[in-house]
Each structure stands twice: as structure tokens, then as C-alpha cells.
Amino acid sequence: MHCPFCNTVDTKVIDSRLVSEGSQIKRRRQCAICHERFTTLEHAELVMPRVIKNDDLLEPFNEQKLRSGMRKALEKRPVSTDALETAIHQIKSQLRATGEPEVPSKMLGQFVMEALKKLDKIAYIRFASVYRSFEDVREFGEEIAKLQDNPSLHQKD
């Protein structure tokens, strides 16, 4: 590791700790030349599959785009940022678990719909209306009826 102060390569770790529920390692380092101390954070870099769009174009997975779309559906809904981040982490895990280098955008959309259905039914309907391009009120009603007909989805808020 290069020292950010004098750019030498000779640094040593003087302390290490797990952070972020064990998903990162925080290391305290000291330069052997200038003796300055600095902190580094290490995390595993996981390769995400690319997304096959409806027009067959390939696009790199974009976590910010996923987060933005889910936030828009969850706008003004009583869902914590932690719950959203957990859902995003689960969706990314599902994508990696496919083992495929490329996944269709429809699969990603289904994972998002499943996650939103668990988080907040209103957000689920909002997302579904855009994702499935609802044309009229009838389609909203049909989707709401599906939610009401599935007793495993009923939760007390």
C-alpha cells in the first residue's frame, strides 16, 4: 500500500477491525519512512452480471439506477433507508446467485417487484404501474386484487 503522504510502498498495518457487519475491514497503517498514520477500508469487489435490455443491448448493472427506481416508488412511504439498502443487497445477491454473466432486465424487474411487495404494497403498485406500463385504472385494480387474494402477503402495519 502506498503512503498517501510520501508515496513510499513501505507501510505496515498496526490495527485491523471488521466494520459494516463484517463486510469491510478497516486497517490503521503507518508509513515506515515518514511515520505518518492513515486508515484504509477494504471490501470484496463482487462482479455483477450485465443486464440485457429489452432492445437486446447489454448494459452494466447500475446499483444507483436500481436505488433511484426503488426510492421513487418508495417516495413518502414509511420505509427506512436501512430496509431499502437491505432489499438492494438481497437483489444483488439474487443476481449473483444466478451464476450468469448476463441477465435479462425482466428478471431484475421481477426481483425488484418481489422486494417492493415485501417492503410496501403501495410502492409495489407504483413500481408495477410503470414497469408493466399500466394503461388504465382497471389494470391497477387487477394488481391490487392479486395482492388482496394472496393471504401470504397480508401484513399488519
Swiss-Prot record:
Family: Belongs to the NrdR family.
Zn finger residue spans: unnamed: 3-34
Keyword Metal-binding found: yes
Superkingdom of source: Bacteria
Function: Negatively regulates transcription of bacterial ribonucleotide reductase nrd genes and operons by binding to NrdR-boxes.
PANTHER family: TRANSCRIPTIONAL REPRESSOR NRDR
InterPro entries hit by this protein: ATP-cone_dom (IPR005144), NrdR-like_N (IPR055173), RNR_NrdR-like (IPR003796)
Keyword set includes Cell wall biogenesis/degradation: no
Domain ATP-cone: 49-139
Keywords on record: ATP-binding, DNA-binding, Metal-binding, Nucleotide-binding, Repressor, Transcription, Transcription regulation, Zinc, Zinc-finger
Pfam families in alphabetical order: ATP-cone (PF03477), Zn_ribbon_NrdR (PF22811)
GO term, biological process aspect, one: negative regulation of DNA-templated transcription
A GO MF term: DNA binding
Co-factor binding comment: Binds 1 zinc ion.
Name of the protein in its database record: Transcriptional repressor NrdR
Cofactor(s) named in the record: Zn(2+)
